[in-house]
């Protein structure tokens, strides 16, 4: 069992990583006997895990209600959020309730925002079931729903009480979802840890076959890096922005193509190549390093070119609505070397469009 602590003073919390955690009531601390829980999951995961998690919580004396959401990025919306509020109010659940998010990034982000908003804030626990959510979205307190004009535009910073990562969940993950998660894994190597990127080049095949020790190390290292960044910059005023490598471009793809048609990790993979091409055009990143990124993403089963039906010009309106925009100016996360990156302002739209075009016709 691995345990990492996100250090945020009195709001610090543990990330527990192991197999078989759904069999152990202690995995769901700080829940105690007699407490009330609303378990939020989706229609795909409910048949796999709902009864198991409900059973282990009830074994610990916890009173469990549940709400099952439709599955898909297109349901990360205010309308679906309202169904969670309605379920909480109908029981009713008070301010002493705990929301448990059992699912991937959509369930985790939406449940976290529900917890931040319901009666001005209730406790919640993240139980991520996808690789992407285990290494990224469940850690750090970013909660949100989407708007038709932009991804994650309505949300709050709100930290969980704990994160429970059961590695056994990955055994039921479709290959496309596994690849999507690997995009976020590769991101950490590009922006923060060149040695980890090297390790990924050597061990990607082991990750693709869900080798236990390799996957445990991979998730632990990603969570360590995320925890360090969040502890230093919880509300993304500086360092934490680096975690958005590829996201400015990627969110544009997701919004333009319709939420759910491209998985988040697929869009981020293309976005990271576009960021690398932008950095190349600025003369601060080598084509050889871009090729290393492309090769690793391709081996992981991820796209490296943007959708053909989306013109370079179609990216700009979405990118100019990005949450990192300041004074109307885009701020891009760009690699400087494998393992080093920067936040860059003042890049001309023409250069960005040319970098996007590099990835459309490649």
Curated annotation (Swiss-Prot):
Q: Cofactors per UniProt? A: Co(2+); Zn(2+); NAD(+)
Q: Name one Pfam family in it.
A: DHQ_synthase
Main enzyme class: lyase
Look up the EC number in the record and give it.
4.2.3.4
Q: Matching InterPro entries, A to Z?
A: Dehydroquinate_synthase, DHQ_synth_AroB, DHQ_synth_fam, DHQS/DOIS_N, DHQS_C
Q: Which residues form the signal peptide?
A: none
Query: What does the cofactor section's free text say about binding?
Result: Binds 1 divalent metal cation per subunit. Can use either Co(2+) or Zn(2+).
Keywords annotated in UniProt: Amino-acid biosynthesis, Aromatic amino acid biosynthesis, Cobalt, Cytoplasm, Lyase, Metal-binding, NAD, Nucleotide-binding, Zinc
Record-listed NAD(+) binding positions: 71-76, 105-109, 129-130, 142, 151, 169-172
UniProt record, GO biological process = amino acid biosynthetic process; aromatic amino acid family biosynthetic process; chorismate biosynthetic process
Record bears the keyword Cell wall biogenesis/degradation: no
Coiled-coil ranges from the UniProt annotation: none
For this protein, what reaction is catalysed? 7-phospho-2-dehydro-3-deoxy-D-arabino-heptonate = 3-dehydroquinate + phosphate
Which is one GO molecular function term here? nucleotide binding
Q: Which residues bind Zn(2+)?
A: 184, 247, 264
Coarsely, its chief localization is: cytoplasm
Q: In which pathway does it act?
A: Metabolic intermediate biosynthesis; chorismate biosynthesis; chorismate from D-erythrose 4-phosphate and phosphoenolpyruvate: step 2/7
Q: Which GO terms describe its cellular component?
A: cytoplasm
PANTHER family (alphabetical):
3-DEHYDROQUINATE SYNTHASE (PTHR43622), 3-DEHYDROQUINATE SYNTHASE, CHLOROPLASTIC (PTHR43622:SF7)
Q: What does this protein do?
A: Catalyzes the conversion of 3-deoxy-D-arabino-heptulosonate 7-phosphate (DAHP) to dehydroquinate (DHQ).
NCBIfam families noted in UniProt: aroB
Q: What is this protein called?
A: 3-dehydroquinate synthase
The species this protein belongs to is Escherichia coli O81 (strain ED1a)
């Amino acid at each position: 069992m691995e345990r990492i602590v996100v250090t945020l003073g009195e709001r610090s919390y543990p990330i527990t990583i192991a197999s078989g955690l759904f069999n152990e009531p202690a995995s769901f601390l700080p829940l105690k006997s007699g407490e009330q829980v609303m378990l939020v999951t989706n229609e795909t995961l409910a048949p796999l895990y709902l009864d198991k998690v409900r059973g282990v919580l009830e074994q610990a004396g916890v009173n469990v209600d549940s709400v099952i959401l439709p599955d898909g990025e297109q349901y990360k919306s205010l309308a679906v959020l309202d169904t969670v509020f309605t379920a909480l109010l109908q029981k009713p659940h008070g301010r002493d309730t705990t929301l448990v998010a059992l699912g991937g990034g959509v369930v985790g982000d939406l449940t976290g925002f529900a917890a931040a908003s319901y009666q001005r804030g209730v406790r919640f626990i993240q139980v991520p079931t996808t690789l992407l959510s285990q290494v990224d979205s469940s850690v750090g307190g970013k909660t949100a729903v989407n708007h038709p004009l932009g991804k994650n535009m309505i949300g709050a910073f709100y930290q969980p009480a704990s994160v429970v990562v059961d590695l056994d969940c990955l055994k039921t993950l479709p290959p496309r979802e596994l690849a999507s998660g690997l995009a976020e894994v590769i991101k950490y190597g590009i922006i923060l840890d060149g040695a980890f990127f090297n390790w990924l080049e050597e061990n990607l095949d082991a990750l693709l076959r869900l080798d236990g020790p390799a996957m445990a190390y991979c998730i632990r290292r990603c969570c360590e890096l995320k925890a360090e960044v969040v502890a230093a910059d919880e509300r993304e005023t500086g360092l934490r922005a680096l975690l958005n490598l590829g996201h400015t471009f990627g969110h544009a793809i997701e919004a333009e193509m319709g939420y759910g048609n491209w998985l988040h990790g697929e869009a981020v993979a293309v976005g990271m190549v576009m960021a690398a091409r932008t950095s190349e055009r600025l003369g601060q990143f080598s084509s050889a390093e871009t090729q290393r990124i492309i090769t690793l993403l391709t081996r992981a089963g991820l796209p490296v070119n943007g959708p053909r039906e989306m013109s370079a010009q179609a990216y700009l309106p979405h990118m100019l609505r990005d949450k990192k925009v300041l004074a109307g100016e885009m701020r891009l996360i760009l690699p400087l070397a494998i393992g080093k990156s920067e936040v860059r302002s003042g890049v001309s739209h023409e250069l960005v469009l040319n970098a996007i075009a590099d990835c459309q016709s490649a």
